[in-house]
Regions:
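Nucleic-acid endonuclease domains
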Residues: 1-51, 56, 60, 66-243
Length: 243
């Protein structure tokens, strides 16, 4: 899909929106057209579906994340779904695309694109999001308190150098890829020493405190390769203090 997207951009195929208020789906529709051009069949996306595009003939899905530029690009709101490399048996590829934040016209181009395997963002596939609630809040004890967790994750633009104004794919090093893709960087992410296992929120002080446990996979390295259709520039992982 990297080549398909790059070809479309080179051919001047732009994102189209119905109006200025149409912000959620234009980039998703642009990518949908690339799938259709390649005759790649998928389940029709829905508002609360994850990932956005679930392929029919292979266990693969694409999750789209459009980023207006200039604007917030180093991280994004995952809402109620943390990044996954594998979800319900499907490998998940995140598609991060940057485009003008406030275009004057209803058709506009894609600045750059990163197709990123979800495990580059989060290697743990075991966590399952659930909303919970407890009743008993308020003066009369009959208010329901809902625990609806929301998540924020880094984007490849926040983690990497060398991806601006480029078309890049970040895949596990063990994956076989097309001969048309050229490696432009070897990336290693190392698991943290501890894992968050819970949190406590004090309603009287509004203080939020996390609880942790030792990570049994602490120090384990996960290897990825950055690919492009051309060699320049190289892609490198930013130092943590520079993110």
């Amino acid at each position: 899909m990297l080549i398909a997207c790059e070809t479309a951009i080179d051919d001047g195929k732009q994102i189209s929106r119905q109006s200025r208020r149409d912000k959620e789906f234009p980039f998703q529709n642009w990518f949908k057209a690339r799938l259709e051009e390649r005759k790649i069949y998928f389940d029709e996306p829905g508002r609360n579906m994850y990932p956005d595009f679930r392929l029919v003939h292979m266990p693969l899905g694409y999750e789209l994340k459009g980023l207006g530029y200039p604007g917030r690009v180093n991280d994004y709101d995952c809402n109620s779904q943390i990044p996954h490399g594998v979800y319900r048996g499907r490998e998940i590829i995140y598609v991060f695309g940057r485009y003008p934040a406030n275009p004057d016209e209803n058709s506009y181009g894609v600045y750059d694109l990163v197709l990123c395997h979800g495990s580059f963002l989060n290697a743990d596939n075991s966590y399952v999001h659930k909303n919970k609630s407890v009743r008993g809040m308020g003066s009369f004890g009959d208010l329901l308190l809902r625990d609806r967790k929301m998540y924020v994750a880094p984007t490849p633009f926040g983690l990497l150098d060398g991806v601006e104004r480029q078309m890049t794919s970040i895949l596990p090093a063990a994956w076989a890829v097309s001969d048309s893709l050229i490696p432009v960087g070897e990336l290693v992410r190392t698991e943290t020493d501890r894992l968050m296992t819970g949190y406590y929120f004090d309603l009287t002080t509004s203080k939020l405190q996390a609880t942790y446990t030792e990570n049994p996979s602490a120090g384990q390295q996960h290897h990825f390769i950055a690919y492009r259709s051309s060699r320049q520039p190289a892609v490198t992982l930013r130092q943590e203090e520079d993110r």
